[in-house]
């Protein structure tokens, strides 16, 4: 029996020799290191079995829900991958995690008893985790640790429910909560792709339609429609109230971000860790909507990673599952669930048709945010800055210059000279003459000194910006020493692990 986890460990080590993996020594080392730990686990289980004269058994238990979830995840990753190359680059990472989870789960079961059960379950667990959080290659060993924590929680943290022992926490959401909390507390968010994941999911063409359509399969099979309906309806009501009070939109340019809509459809709809009754599931969804909305406002206010809003509340809701079932009502299934599926579809059609959901939200208008900023509405200036930055990176180069002016002046927003210099350089490099004309003045009027001070304090981004502004013909008049100083600053940025700087130097 132990040949199976040993073979999985061998498969994991083999993945380290793929060109895309081998090109990153820390990533390859994490694959090999985890394969070695699994092999050691095999030896440990074998020794424990001999000491206790045990016969290990394995049962393959295919669960319909798991292979349906797997199919949904494949479709979702495919749509996402067609709009962001990062998904294709991450495929070896996902395969490695699946091999690791299968092996770790088997070894954990055999360490604790004679029989292990397996099926398709590890695939959607890994898929769900990777819809929200990836670690950078330099820290990818933490991704395996995250999965191990989830497996341990599923195996060890139980309660009595409906006459049987079952796990309390969703094996995806619990480790996501734990790791996100630690990352935030230690100011280590830079170690992950969490923000890029949240942003790029909203760039999928027809993202909300795809998420809704795939979510229908989950809702129909698991009878979790009321969870999703409750969450989305609550977020809609809170958005309306927010706009009524502040005159602006909470999530800037969309009613519910795609990443949060994904959470409403897939993260909190695990039937094993959510309430079983119709009233309980509706309340569960309402509480999720309230928690996500409140967490977003709070994280934004304290300067935390607002993209963790959908992840930090789920384990606490899992703990309420049995209490919420005491609200009474019939089980959430059968024809009643199909009725709620139809009602949810009608509600989605209304929200999508009114542009509350989807890519055509009224908050897409830069003029709206400029006027709101001039009127000093709540968070309007920071939202305007965010919108300008997004438009800049979508190829509207004039918006880069506007963003630079906004952050250089420091009138409506806190002055941020590294950001201003970056956007001036980007606009100038793309041929915007007016931005090029501003650079010399920006450097002479305190920009160079501010960037140099930040660079000397080991801010790699400032080193890169200053080096970029000094390089080439961006900063007139000519300076014979400028090229050498520019290269030195960019080299320092590369030393400080700014990948764009290393790319600039060809390293």
Where is each model-derived feature located?
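N-terminal signal-anchor module of multipass membrane proteins
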Residues: 1-110, 356
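C-terminal ends of transmembrane helices
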Residues: 41-57, 101-114, 150-165, 212-223, ...
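Membrane-interface helix-loop-helix junctions at boundaries between adjacent transmembrane segments
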Residues: 108-201
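Internal active-site segments that recognize and position negatively charged phosphoryl groups
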Residues: 175, 183-241
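Internal/C-terminal transmembrane anchor helices
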Residues: 334-359
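Short helix-capping/linker turns of helical repeat alpha-solenoids
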Residues: 375-378, 388-389, 394-397, 403, ...
